[in-house]
């Protein structure tokens, strides 16, 4: 790659940049990755333009510059590059490097979807589901999620599963919800893993199975997903699908608290109030209840009120 890159072969330059980014066969270096991405981008290679744009977006090897990131994504998009089109849409959707504009986001998502981007199909589906930048149309959202899901997009699979769960835009079907949650869960998506675990927990679309529920909650928890860690705490507290263990419950609640879960703050507060899995500490319980209460957790608000009483 280096020999070809030094002879200004843009594909080789981009590939060499990726090797420096990933540290494969060379010492990892964002600065060298940027150097070679830039060389290929300046020759007009869309893939390199997108890779360099990403470096500017997240400040890897260069100071973060969202405006420059957008400019580079736009260059790739103007060549019809699916990733470039999708990333321009995201810039407009979230106001990164440009003024937020949902209508513009929809237009670019549509172009990216037409170019075959499954991620764009999913995000365009979200726009139709929520009525952001376009009139709300659940049937269209379902169609787009299905296209994305069948192309293997995990978010599209999970979103389609949720519409089957809720019966919005499609006939309600727990079996179809489980089918699509499983597809996304097997790709490692924490939200889908938790949704599938919940189906096993309550026997929705599958036979109730606590061990399978714990399996999927743990998969999400091991990725530090707040809901997954909170639900593992519940399972350990009550011995659902695992042996009852207060210390393990506290461990998972604490992880979920660190990830911002108000429900976990409340439940960990209960552990401190009662001395379950930890030494009893009313002051720590009150502190946790207050944190959760300030995040509008109703149970914590009630528990905090009781302590004041």
Where are these regions (language model features)?
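Low-complexity/repetitive intrinsically disordered segments
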Residues: 1-7, 298-309
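Short helix-capping/linker turns of helical repeat alpha-solenoids
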Residues: 6-9, 22-24, 29, 37, ...
């Amino acid at each position: 790659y280096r020999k070809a890159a030094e002879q200004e072969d843009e594909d080789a330059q981009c590939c060499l940049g990726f090797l420096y980014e990933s540290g494969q066969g060379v010492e990892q270096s964002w600065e060298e990755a940027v150097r070679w991405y830039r060389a290929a981008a300046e020759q007009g290679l869309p893939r390199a333009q997108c890779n360099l744009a990403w470096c500017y977006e997240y400040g890897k090897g260069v100071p973060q510059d969202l405006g420059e990131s957008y400019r580079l994504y736009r260059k790739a998009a103007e060549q019809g590059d699916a990733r470039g089109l999708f990333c321009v849409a995201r810039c407009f959707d979230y106001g990164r490097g440009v003024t937020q504009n949902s209508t513009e986001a929809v237009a670019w998502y549509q172009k990216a979807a037409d170019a075959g981007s499954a991620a764009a199909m999913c995000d365009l589906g979200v726009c139709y589901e929520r009525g952001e930048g376009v009139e709300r149309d659940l049937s269209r959202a379902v169609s787009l999620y299905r296209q994305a899901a069948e192309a293997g997009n995990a978010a599209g699979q999970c979103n389609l599963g949720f519409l089957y769960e809720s019966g919005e835009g499609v006939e309600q079907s727990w079996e179809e919800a489980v089918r699509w949650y499983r597809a996304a869960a097997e790709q490692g998506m924490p939200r889908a893993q938790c949704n599938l675990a919940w189906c096993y927990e309550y026997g929705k679309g599958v036979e109730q199975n606590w061990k399978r529920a714990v399996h999927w909650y743990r998969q999400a928890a091991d990725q530090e997903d707040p809901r997954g860690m909170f639900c593992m705490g519940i399972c350990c507290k009550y011995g659902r699908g695992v042996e009852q263990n207060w210390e393990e419950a506290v461990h998972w609640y604490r992880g979920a608290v660190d990830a911002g879960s108000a429900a976990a703050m409340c439940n960990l507060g209960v552990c401190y109030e009662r001395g379950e899995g930890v030494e009893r500490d009313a002051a720590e319980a009150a502190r946790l209840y207050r944190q959760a209460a300030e995040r509008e957790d109703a149970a914590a608000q009630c528990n905090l009120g009781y302590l004041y009483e």
